[in-house]
Amino acid sequence: MINIIQIKDLDAPELQIYYNLNEAQLFHYFEPKPGIFIAESPKVIERALDAGCVPMSFLMEKKHVETQAKEILARCEKLQSRDLTQKSLVYREDEHVIPVYVAEIEVLAKITGYQLTRGMLCAMYRPALSSVEQLCKNARRVAILENVVNPTNVGAIFRSAAALGMDAVLLTTGCSNPLYRRAIRVSMGTVFQVPWTYLGEETKPETVRNPDSEEEKEPGTGIERNLEPEEKADSGNWQKQLHELGFHTVAMALKEDSLSIDDPKLMNEDKLAIVLGTEGDGLAPETIAACDDTVCIPMAHGVDSLNVAAASAVAFWQLGRQAHKDNCCNMNSNYQLWE
């Protein structure tokens, strides 16, 4: 059931999740259970619903209730009639009600970055992540991100992964979380269309910016990660796991013996895992050494590297098209991500 609640200011405690909590606080909101994330704009919210994500509440301009939010709210009414007690609403006592907070734009405009939300925000429960084995069971092309710390890059990589046919994305625990606000926004909601999980631990501690900092920051970007993570990815363990699942692993790195990305050997691999490294330093030497092959993108004008998000798009297109050549233009984008 939907409950429309008119608000005249942002002082209510239940609204702090939209403008006053950083990503770490949202992530740990129901600790030790999974927390929440914020989806922005009708398109992104629809993609999250398509993936089975469950709303906790909405915040939107009053005029949108009968316009661009109408179909979304109708979906949520139907959602309530199903057995949601098996999903994330077990966190709430009032589990049969989804509050929809509405206000005039003059009130909502006080939220930094509100103009980017297209007039609608939704707090949703973080779903439990699947195991690597579950995600890779029928996959032929997967992307592996090692310590990619910038949520903008993570979001852009997911958008390319969705568009260019990756079957799953696996992240080391040093990566920025795909459900951070900026990552979701940059991905245009495709983080809900590509199955993903962590290699190893599913959760990890976050480093939060000093709350007294005078630096202006956008909601959802209050996380400051070390650009050189203290914890190194245990590449030996996940490499072994991927090999047991039948994957040939390729490290995207520039070495004297690197294969060109269009090498026929790579195109003919049945199951391929494409490993991309952190901004700046790229992949750890031990990760490169543990991969079956090292692959590079031929470049001109003496350029020796691309931004990790740009490199991922090239790699996904070249190395993914053979596996998906029969259906690359007809991929189903509405499958369920989490059970």
Give the predicted meaning of each segment.
Residues 68-93, 287:
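Short, aromatic/basic amphipathic alpha-helical patches
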Residues 2, 43, 50, 81-87, ...:
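RNA substrate-binding interface of SAM-dependent RNA methyltransferases
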Residues 78-83, 93-109:
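A glycine-rich helix N-cap at a beta->alpha junction
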Residues 120-122, 160-164, 178-191, 285-339:
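Structured adenosyl-cofactor binding patch, chiefly the S-adenosyl-L-methionine
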Residues 7, 37, 146-147, 172-173, ...:
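Glycine- and other small-residue-rich loops at beta-strand/loop junctions that grip anionic moieties
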Residues 250-301:
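Active-site/ligand-binding-proximal alpha/beta "capping" segment
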Residues 1-66:
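Boundary-proximal intrinsically disordered activation/regulatory segments immediately upstream
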